[in-house]
UniProtKB/Swiss-Prot annotation:
Family recorded in the similarity comment: Belongs to the IF-3 family.
InterPro entries: T_IF-3_C_sf (IPR036788), T_IF-3_N_sf (IPR036787), Translation_initiation_fac3_CS (IPR019813), Translation_initiation_fac_3 (IPR001288), Translation_initiation_fac_3_C (IPR019815), Translation_initiation_fac_3_N (IPR019814)
The protein's name in its UniProt record: Translation initiation factor IF-3
Function comment: IF-3 binds to the 30S ribosomal subunit and shifts the equilibrium between 70S ribosomes and their 50S and 30S subunits in favor of the free subunits, thus enhancing the availability of 30S subunits on which protein synthesis initiation begins.
Quaternary assembly: Monomer.
Keywords carried by this UniProt record: Cytoplasm, Initiation factor, Protein biosynthesis
PANTHER family: TRANSLATION INITIATION FACTOR IF-3, TRANSLATION INITIATION FACTOR IF-3, MITOCHONDRIAL
GO BP terms in the entry: ribosome disassembly
GO cellular component: cytosol; membrane
GO molecular function, one term: ribosome binding
Top-level division of the source organism's lineage: Bacteria
Cellular compartments annotated: Cytoplasm
Length: 190
């Protein structure tokens, strides 16, 4: 007896589109290539009209009563659908949570670097998790860490809004910032 294969070598079953002879409904509501309704026609008559125009009969809506078909060039239609799907994939941006870590005794330049990193993350549409790390007895100074995080939120006010206020989580204090949908308009004191 031959050994059993570890995986299925058959080609995956692809669902074929409902066009031309694959449409099994006897009555169809037909729309021509210009968008003009031809009314409810039987399937054979609709196929005949499509072949006269050298186009395909494509099932658009199966759930309608009777099902809706359109007379169009299926190759061109498929290409347009793939192009739209590709554009949609390109435009969709997965929001990630980026982290900026620091200690509560951070120097000015290091703080400016963290602000720059957070700004870059927010401009690219990602959320920012600001973390202040405590070591040893530093946890007693959580009020200084909270002040630092609030200062950071204030400095990033134009690009972000506070999603979660500073709170202690284990040996860290964290705060979440999310990018602003609309730019903040500052009021002038005049």
């Amino acid at each position: 007896m031959p050994p059993r294969p570890r995986f299925d070598r058959r080609a995956p079953v692809r669902e074929l589109p409902n066009i031309n002879e694959r449409i099994k409904y006897p009555q169809l509501r037909v729309v021509d290539s210009d968008g003009k309704q031809l009314g409810v026609i039987d399937r054979l008559k609709a196929l005949e009209i499509a072949s006269q125009r050298e186009l395909d009969l494509v099932l658009v809506s199966e759930k309608a009563n009777p099902p809706v078909c359109r007379i169009m060039d299926y190759g061109k239609y498929k290409f347009e659908q793939e192009k739209k799907a590709k554009e949609a994939r390109k435009k969709s941006h997965q929001t990630e949570v980026k982290e900026v870590k620091m200690r509560y005794k951070i120097d000015k330049h290091d703080y400016d670097v963290r602000i720059g990193q957070a700004t870059k993350f927010l401009k690219s549409g990602d959320k920012v998790k600001c973390t202040v790390i405590f070591r040893g007895r530093e946890i007693q100074h959580s009020n200084l860490a909270e002040t630092l995080l609030l200062r950071m939120a204030n400095d990033l006010e134009e690009q972000s809004e506070v999603q979660q206020k500073p709170k202690r989580e284990g040996r860290n204090m964290i705060m979440f910032l999310s990018p602003r949908k609309t730019p903040l308009i500052k009021k002038d004191d005049a």
